[in-house]
Amino acid sequence: MKEFDYDKLVTAIDRFSPSKLIGKGSHGYVYKALLHHQDVDETRQRVVAIKTPSSLSPSSPSSSSSSKSEQTKKLENEIDVMSSLPYHPHVLSFLGHAEKKLMVVEYMPNESLYQLLHVSTDPLPTWLKRIEIALQIASAVHFLHEHGIIHRDIKSENILFDSNWEAKLADFGLAVDFGGDKKIRPAPAGTIGYLDPCYTLPENLSMKTDVYSYGVVLLEIVSCRKAIDVSRSPASIVDWAVPLIKEGRIGEICGGGGGGSGVFRGMSLRLLRMAARCVSSDVESRPCFGEITAEIVACLAEPLKSLPLWMSVLRRVVKLKRRKKRLRETLTWPGQTCRVW
């Protein structure tokens, strides 16, 4: 993993200047920075994000020594987990660290899924784009599970977008390496509304814990409703959506984009039934991410069956051209190669 000079990173964010601050979390601050490095005969530049424990920032409220230690441990854990993973197009790319106090990751200019669905005044993404986002995140979590990592904090705020509006899973502060013989079981943690209600004891942690959280995100994507909305009754998206799914009232769930009608109705019903399985109180009945990704791929193909042959072919050609426009660009840092999509 690449190690950066601590002082150079601090200088790049103007010594934790508020003008460079782009995000705050419960355990850390995120700053935007422009880094330079010498590559053969030229100096290359890259915009990155630098994450710090909030205790390092002069503008952060004073906190106890135990709180500072907890923040530092979470960042160190995030660095350890992310540095152990190979590249995946829908997992935020780790670029390096400085003394395990500052973490450098790729910069994501288009904010989060939460912002897109619940805050932005721009039109919602199309129905198919929203389901494509759901597939991208499912593939990311499937990748993590194949490498023995349980994320433990899957939520719309931790799904970020790059310049091409490709979704990437971020924030590995609570992630656990569950691979091999490690089987680390920390105390339950996560975000209310996304946290698996069956995860009440350390020994209850499993890959299905992430499945529940993903199911909440999938309901959020389909309905455009928040995971917890105290202005509504019931406040929980799960308590609201699951009874409607069981009754087949999908038109009352799908938010924007025509997901509940026309050629998308069959797709919507399949997705919502799968979401209901993800958030089931019967942990063993929840699907694994291999099954989830396969089902979403099948759902995305469903509307094409209803189209005339020439439209299906045209759609595939257009999609192929769009993919070619997003050919991978390789950026080489000293000691590391990182592809940006």
From Swiss-Prot:
Protein name as it appears in the record: Serine/threonine-protein kinase-like protein At5g23170
Residues annotated as the enzyme's active site: 153
Region of interest called Disordered, as start-end residue ranges on this chain: 52-75
Effect annotated for changing residue 111 to G: In strain: cv. Bla-10, cv. Bl-0, cv. Can-0, cv. Cnt-1, cv. Cvi-0, cv. Di-G, cv. Ema-1, cv. Ka-0, cv. Kas-1, cv. Landsberg erecta, cv. Lip-0, cv. No-0, cv. Pa-1, cv. Petergof, cv. Sei-0, cv. Sorbo, cv. Tac-0 and cv. Tsu-0
Phenotypic consequence of residue 177 to E: In strain: cv. Bla-10, cv. Bl-0, cv. Can-0, cv. Cnt-1, cv. Cvi-0, cv. Di-G, cv. Ema-1, cv. Ka-0, cv. Kas-1, cv. Landsberg erecta, cv. No-0, cv. Pa-1, cv. Petergof, cv. Sei-0, cv. Sorbo, cv. Tac-0 and cv. Tsu-0
Organism (species): Arabidopsis thaliana (Mouse-ear cress)
Documented effect of changing residue 297 to M: In strain: cv. Can-0, cv. Cvi-0, cv. Di-G, cv. Landsberg erecta, cv. Lip-0, cv. Petergof, cv. Sorbo and cv. Tsu-0
Residue ranges annotated for the Protein kinase domain, each copy included: 16-298
Tissues expressed in: Ubiquitous. Higher expression in mature stamina and pollen.
Reactions the enzyme catalyzes: L-seryl-[protein] + ATP = O-phospho-L-seryl-[protein] + ADP + H(+); L-threonyl-[protein] + ATP = O-phospho-L-threonyl-[protein] + ADP + H(+)
